[in-house]
Amino acid sequence: IFLNALTTPIAQELLNKKIVMDILAMKTRDGELGLFAAMENNHPLCVTRFLSKINGIAFKYKLSKANIMDLLKGATAHGTPVLYIAMSKGNEDVVLSYISTLNIFAKKYSFSQRQLFTLLAAKNHDNMSAVHIAIHHNHYKTVKTYYAAINVISQSLSFSADELKTYL
């Protein structure tokens, strides 16, 4: 409901891009975004709706590609991306939701391959990728879901899954 309010005409008159970014990037006391909590606790519908709202808000407030990338990465104060935490927990449903939605953002905002791969690799502050942490925790089904989602979006974005693997 709150994110819906940001897209109303009156909000657009009262709010500027900086205020909207501050609202979207609000963090808990632990330095976590709302998207992080949804990914960590395996709430795919929340992830899909939040990212959908970001998509609409980004357009209305003319957010930069860098702003959008920061919101999609959703990193904690320690630099842990949202996809990394979902993979480390074995939350395959949100992994699928997140990657499927990235496809929409990548097309709409013309992400470079490097930008997309940065989000998909989801490396932590120690440079460990989301795939590696999932394997480390024996979340093989989540890794399988990850690569299946990658294969789907790779066809529409013209890259091969092997290209991404070399980036991991």
Q: Over which residues does each language-model region extend?
A:
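Ankyrin repeat domain, specifically the short helix-to-loop turn at the C-terminus of the second helix
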Residues: 3-23, 49-71, 97-119, 147-166
